[in-house]
Amino acid sequence: ADGVNDDERMWQTFLYLRDPANSSELDSNHYAMPLPISPVISQDLKVIRIDYLPTGKDATVGELKPWTSKPANEYLSEYQKLRTDLKPLQVVQPEGASFTVTEQGTSQIIQWQKWRFTVGFNQREGMVLYNVRYDGRSLFHRVSLSDMNIPYADPRHPFHKKAAFDLGDVGAGIMANDLKLGCDCLGSIHYISSVLADDKGNPYDMPNVICVHEQDGGIGWKHTNYRTGRAAVVRNRELVVQSIITVANYEYIMAYHFNQAGEFAYEVRATGILSTQPIDEGIEVPWGTVVHPGVLATHHQHIFSLRVDPAIDGHQNRLVYDEAHALPRSDLNPHGTGYTTNETIVETSGGYEIDYAANRTFKIQNVGVRNPINGKPVAYKIHAPPFQKILSDNDSFNYKRAEFADKSIYAVKHRDGELYAGGKYTNQSRGGEGVRSWADRKENIVDNDLVVYVQFGINH
C-alpha cells in the first residue's frame, strides 16, 4: 500500500534468472541474477502492466539492453571449497535430555528445571507459549512474536513498496522448516510437529517445526576467594525451544531460552540471502551495497514485536521503569560521587522509550506480592537491546502501517482479539488497527490486565 491504486488488490513482483550456464540446477542462486523488469499482477493472475526498474544513480529508467553473461554466485556446498582443518565437535548426552514433553490436545507441556509451560503452534505466529510458570509460580499467560516489518531504503518507484510484514502477510507457522538433526539442532532433540490448514482449508502436515534441546550457556556464576585461592564455579545450562522459518529469500531462527536462574529470553537470528535488485556495473548508490557484479542489496530494517501477556503471580500487574541519576553536590554528597535510582509508574497505555543515558529499564510488577528479603514488589525486568526505529517519515504508509515500529515499548490494556501489533490484516493495510492505535486509548493499566509489546531490530 502506498496510497496509489490501493482499492484493487495487486502484486508487484520482482524477477530473477536461473544461471543459464547451469539451468538444470533447480537450487541455483537466482538472487545473483535480478532482472530489470517488474510485472504487476492482479488477483486473478493477469498481468496489469510491466514496470521497468531504475538501475542507475537516480529514478531514471534506462533503455533495456540484451542480457549479458554474468558470473554465478552459488551457495550450495558442492559449489564451495570447504575447509579441512576443523576437528569434530560432538554434543553427547549419554543419559538423554533432562526435560520432559507431555502431549495435551494439540499442544505440548514442557517441564525442565522448575520451568513448566505449554507450547502451541499456529499459522501466523508460529510458536506460542502459554501458562509459563517457574517453581509453581505464574509468570506469563501468553508470549509470542506478534509481527515484524522490513522497510527497505530505496526511495524510487516501485522499490518504495518493499515493506513486508513477514508474519501478517505470510505467516511464521506456515513457512516453518522441517528441522533436521546435525545442523538445525544439536544434542538430544525432541521434535514437535503440527498440522495447519493450506490455502484451500485442507489439513497440511508440518513435521518437525519445533526442536527442543539443552545447551551449555557458559559460566553461570563464579567467585574466587583470593585469600585462600579457592574458586566456586557453576555452569549455566539452557533449555532452547526453536523454530526456523523461510520467507522468500530470508531465514529467521527463532528461539525461546530458559535458564536455571529463572531468566527467560527470546532470540531472533536473521540468515538466508539478501533481497537483491539490478544495478548498472560501476555504479554506487547510498541506499544499498553492491554484493555481486550488477547486483545491489538494498539497506533495510528488520523490526520485530514480541507480545508479552504477563501474569506475574497473577494478572493484576503494572509496568514501571527505573532510572539512575547523579546526586547534586550537597553536605550529603560533598565529593560529587553519589547517585540514586528512582522508579516511575506507567499509568496509561502508550508507547515508551528506553533511555540508555539514564539506564532506564522497564519492569513488570505485582505489588500484591513482595520479595521476602527487601519487601519490594516481585517483578520481571525487560532487557531489550537498542535499535534504530523506523526511518520512514510519519506521513509515509510504511510508518502508518507498522504501528509498532516507532517505540521500544508499547503497553496496552488487554482486550480479546488484539494479538497482532501491525493489525489483523496487514496486506495493503492503511494503519489505524494496530498497537499504536490501541495505545492511543490512554486506558489505565496500573494493577490491571495489561499486555506489553517489546520491540527490537537491526538495520543493515
Pin down the residues of each PLM region.
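Long, charge-dense tracts
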Residues: 2-14
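Extended effector regions of multi-domain proteins
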Residues: 1-4, 18-263, 269, 273-460
